[in-house]
């Protein structure tokens, strides 16, 4: 009996020893295969899933805390040894503003200036094209850790994908007279845009170590990220840091939802805001406040959350973007840009009313006076369906489409590089049959571009959705590679020129190029709103 027990313990001991050795071997194998890269600040170790090497949460600038709050980003601190880069960095301070952003709880950290790099695990190119993503969120929300913006699938198209966090809301865009005085160039605000610029400088200095080409960088973004792309094109500070640009829904033009106001206007407005809500007005007092107190004062429910945004500061933006593009002073790079078919809901234009023929007439008279009849020819209201569609179209035009069109139009007049325009028409199908059908709504294209359809669980994804996602990843990465989205097996996407009738690529279950049949509408709106 004792011998039998001894044998059993001996056998169990061998099994345990085997498991321990297997674990040690597995850990050693993982450690040996974990990719390492030496950046200017120090070595980083990422993770390898067999398809992509991911390096997450790499600091690209000094933490903007304490006396560095509301200052342009400084150099990232150096470190010794190997820094683990296997987890996303903290998201920047923000409140809960958008229901579709389910990636985090409100809050975050001021120490948030990190970026992520996704590199194809196997590639033959000596230098890979680089795509730098700028998230949207109205300049008040957003983070790189949102799953639908994960670059691991897109990188498998043979590109390096980079994404960065940047300061938001009051932390990224406060304008104050004392900030202008201490700046050295009499400017204030736009710290979030300067963060983006610092990330681009980091890419320029470090991406070669990851196998990327610093001379072939494409910036791309959606909504506020697209506004940012147009602003980086307009900024003389960004010259030479990127060679191509992709804008998805938005630009720093026209009466968009995110207007870039003059410095003097913002100084007065922001001072009233901070004094009224915080009871302090001196810069030293504001810098001494806890970050959470600042956030709580300007985030829902205390505010709608949109009190602070970019301004024409005289430094990052010497003039408004339309003036810079109009004079041909922009960073002239190849541009791919467009918007979604259903960018805005009725509430943007008609809240609290529902659209009807009479309310459309009232709106036309209010907005365009003696040109109301011309407006109604462009937005017909002769049937209930036309009223519904025209109300949606006008809401989307006011919110996003017109500003994006004006950006494309300005670049076509003074730029010399090719332009490709699209309209995203694919309407995701809700899994819940009782859920509202929102069409090709604002931001709907993000999952397709990144190949992250499965990140959105409340949608029933069809084979047509997956096919379009595959095409869009190829179009976007081809454009990043060569400045031309076309490639083998893809429907032809002609450049945006008057010779071909200003063609627009409709991205749907049957992607195809069409002549622009809405040009008169945008010419009318642009001319009227310029008055």
What are these regions (language model features)?
Residues 244, 252-257, 281, 285-464, ...:
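Substrate-gating cap/lid region and adjacent catalytic-acid/histidine neighborhood
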Residues 97-283, 315-350:
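Serine-hydrolase-like catalytic core of hydrolytic proteins
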Residues 1-12:
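N-terminal secretory signal peptides that target proteins for export/translocation
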Residues 2, 29-190, 214, 455, ...:
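Non-catalytic accessory segments of hydrolases
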Residues 167-170, 220-224, 423-430, 491-497:
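Short, solvent-exposed turn/loop segments enriched in Gly/Ser/Thr/Pro and often Arg
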Residues 11-26:
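Bacterial N-terminal signal peptides
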Residues 215-217, 280-285, 419-423, 487-494:
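Surface-exposed patches in mature extracellular/periplasmic domains of secreted proteins
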């Amino acid at each position: 009996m004792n011998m039998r027990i001894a044998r059993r313990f001996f056998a169990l001991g061998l099994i345990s020893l085997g498991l321990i050795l297997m674990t040690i071997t597995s850990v050693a194998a993982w450690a040996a295969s974990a990719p390492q890269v030496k950046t200017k600040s120090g070595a980083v170790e990422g993770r390898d899933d067999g398809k992509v090497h991911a390096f997450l949460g790499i600091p690209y600038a000094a933490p903007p805390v304490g006396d560095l709050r509301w200052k342009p980003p400084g150099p990232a601190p150096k470190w010794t040894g190997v820094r683990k880069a296997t987890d996303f960095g903290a998201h920047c301070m923000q409140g809960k503003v958008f229901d579709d952003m389910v990636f985090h709880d409100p809050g975050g950290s001021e120490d948030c200036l990190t970026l992520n790099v996704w590199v194809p695990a196997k590639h033959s190119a000596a230098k890979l094209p680089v795509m730098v993503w700028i998230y949207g969120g109205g300049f008040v929300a957003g983070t790189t850790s949102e799953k639908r913006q994960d670059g691991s699938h897109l990188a498998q198209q043979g590109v390096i994908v980079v994404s960065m966090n940047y300061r938001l809301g009051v932390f990224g865009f406060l304008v104050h007279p004392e900030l202008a005085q201490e700046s050295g160039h009499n400017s204030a605000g736009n710290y979030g845009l300067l963060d983006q610029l610092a990330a681009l400088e980091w890419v320029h200095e470090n991406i070669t170590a990851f196998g990327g080409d610093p001379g072939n960088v494409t910036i791309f973004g959606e909504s506020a990220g697209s506004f940012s792309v147009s602003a980086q094109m307009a900024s003389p500070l960004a010259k030479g840091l990127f060679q191509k640009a992709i804008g998805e829904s938005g630009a720093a033009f026209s009466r968009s939802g995110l207007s870039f106001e003059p410095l003097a206007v913002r100084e007065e407005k922001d001072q009233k805001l901070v004094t009224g809500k915080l009871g302090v007005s001196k810069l030293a007092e504001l810098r001494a406040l806890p970050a959470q107190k600042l956030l709580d004062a300007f985030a829902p429910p205390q505010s709608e959350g949109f009190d602070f945004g970019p301004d024409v500061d005289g430094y990052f933006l010497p003039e408004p973007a339309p003036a810079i593009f109009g004079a041909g002073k922009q960073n002239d790079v190849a541009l791919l840009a467009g918007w979604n078919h259903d960018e805005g809901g009725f509430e943007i234009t008609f809240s609290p009313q529902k659209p009807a023929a009479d309310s459309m007439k009232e709106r036309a008279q209010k907005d365009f006076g003696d040109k109301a009849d011309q407006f109604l020819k462009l937005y017909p209201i002769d049937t209930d369906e036309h009223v519904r569609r025209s109300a949606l179209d006008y809401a989307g035009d006011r919110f996003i489409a017109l500003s994006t069109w004006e950006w494309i139009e300005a670049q076509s007049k003074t730029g010399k590089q090719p332009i490709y325009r699209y309209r995203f028409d694919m309407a995701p199908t809700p899994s819940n049959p009782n859920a509202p059908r929102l069409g090709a709504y604002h931001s709907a294209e993000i999952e397709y571009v990144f190949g992250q359809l499965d990140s959105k669980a409340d949608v029933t994804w069809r084979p047509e959705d997956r096919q379009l996602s595959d095409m869009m990843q190829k179009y976007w990465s081809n454009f990043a590679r060569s400045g031309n989205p076309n490639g083998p097996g893809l429907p032809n996407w002609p450049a945006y020129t008057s010779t071909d009738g200003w063609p627009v690529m409709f991205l749907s279950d049957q992607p195809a190029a069409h002549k622009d049949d809405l040009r008169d509408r945008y010419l009318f709106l642009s001319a009227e709103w310029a008055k």
